[in-house]
């Protein structure tokens, strides 16, 4: 009965996310076994701060500037200060880099991140952020290199051996999560008073929501810890008299949250009340694209996953949904 080691541990009946603006999210999870609040809180915090991928400027080239210790006529800040300001530009980028962005501005006035001319899959999240200030008649042109990565990469590691003269490497702050704190309190479940309640506050740069960041971090931990599981769980035997002949493929009883979709795709399906694969395959492509926040990228991802199972969108499923769908899903879970 090795399953009792994990099956009989209490799991949170409440996992609640509350957003406070665009960049801050609170998470409450309770009840947890005593000690698990600290275990999970510390593990999630470390992964959130160190292991999530993001985008950042890795280098900048400024017309007329050969190195970071220069000054520019008509610009109040020196190049060192400008580079420090460039480090704070918050960026969301789809796909991999490197990508190029250009900024051209004439004075007088402040030069902000919103003045940068971005390419289609790059978005500036803090357009009001000031990069430098121009005097009357001054002009500046910059070209930025943007890439994806994780954690913090110092400027000297962003310096390519064949870099042209005037290309200034920048410290890259890739992590989309800027700050994480947590606390553990006592909570009760029935008559038991010594369970844990975990409360976390996650602050991001806006390129990812706090809820998605926690989901990514949990998936990383799941992937790493799974390597230590050195056994197969015993299969449940279904009595012959309980086996019912279905009019459809039992795989349709599998829940869509088991498909390992991206967080965006999974959330779109959840918001559209699509629970089982049988619900999903009856949707047409046009119906899916009308789902809020569901785009062509998510559609292609779902089509690819379904194709690997021999399924596709727009299928007709007889006798769907069955009245006892939850019971059937549990009965057939070992068959798919």
Curated annotation (Swiss-Prot):
Catalytic class of the enzyme: transferase
- One Pfam family from the UniProt entry? RNA_pol_A_bac
Q: How does this chain assemble? A: Homodimer. The RNAP catalytic core consists of 2 alpha, 1 beta, 1 beta' and 1 omega subunit. When a sigma factor is associated with the core the holoenzyme is formed, which can initiate transcription.
- The entry's keywords: DNA-directed RNA polymerase, Nucleotidyltransferase, Transcription, Transferase
| Name of the protein described by the UniProt record | DNA-directed RNA polymerase subunit alpha
The record lists the lineage as: Bacteria, Pseudomonadati, Pseudomonadota, Alphaproteobacteria, Hyphomicrobiales
- HAMAP family (UniProt xref): RNApol_bact_RpoA (MF_00059)
Cellular component, GO annotation:
cytoplasm; DNA-directed RNA polymerase complex
Instruction: List the InterPro entries.
Output: DNA-dir_RNA_pol_insert (IPR011262), DNA-dir_RNA_pol_RpoA/D/Rpb3 (IPR011263), DNA-dir_RpoA (IPR011773), RBP11-like (IPR036603), RNAP_asu_C (IPR011260), RNApol_insert_sf (IPR036643)
Function in brief = DNA-dependent RNA polymerase catalyzes the transcription of DNA into RNA using the four ribonucleoside triphosphates as substrates.
């Amino acid at each position: 009965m090795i399953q009792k080691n994990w099956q009989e541990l209490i799991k949170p009946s409440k996992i609640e996310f509350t957003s406070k603006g665009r960049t801050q999210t609170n998470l409450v999870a309770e009840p947890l076994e005593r000690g698990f609040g600290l275990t999970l809180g510390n593990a999630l915090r470390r992964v959130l701060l160190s292991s999530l991928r993001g985008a950042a400027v890795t280098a900048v080239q400024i017309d007329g500037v050969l190195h970071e210790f220069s000054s520019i006529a008509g610009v109040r800040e020196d190049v060192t200060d400008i580079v420090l300001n460039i480090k704070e530009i918050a960026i969301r980028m789809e796909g991999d880099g490197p990508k190029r962005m250009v900024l051209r501005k004439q004075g007088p006035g402040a030069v902000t991140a919103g003045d940068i001319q971005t390419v289609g899959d790059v978005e500036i999240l803090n357009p009001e952020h000031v990069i430098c200030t121009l005097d009357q008649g001054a002009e500046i042109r910059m070209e930025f290199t943007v890439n994806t990565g994780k954690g913090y990469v110092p400027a000297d590691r962003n310096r390519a051996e064949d870099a042209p003269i005037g290309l200034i490497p920048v410290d890259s702050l890739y992590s989309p999560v800027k700050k994480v704190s947590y606390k553990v309190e006592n909570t009760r479940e029935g008559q038991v008073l010594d369970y844990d309640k975990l409360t976390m506050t996650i602050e991001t740069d806006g390129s990812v929501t706090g809820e998605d960041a926690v989901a990514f971090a949990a998936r990383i931990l799941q992937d790493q810890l799974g390597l230590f599981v050195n056994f197969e769980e015993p299969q449940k035997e279904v009595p012959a008299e309980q086996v019912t002949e279905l009019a459809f493929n039992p795989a349709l009883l599998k829940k869509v949250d088991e498909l390992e979709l991206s967080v965006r795709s999974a959330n779109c399906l959840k918001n559209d009340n699509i629970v089982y694969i049988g619900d999903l395959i009856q949707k047409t492509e046009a119906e899916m694209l009308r789902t809020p926040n569901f785009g062509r990228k998510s559609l292609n991802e779902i089509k690819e996953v379904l194709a690997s199972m021999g399924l596709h969108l727009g299928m007709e499923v007889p006798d769907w949904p069955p009245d006892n769908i939850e019971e059937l899903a549990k009965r057939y879970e070992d068959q798919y």
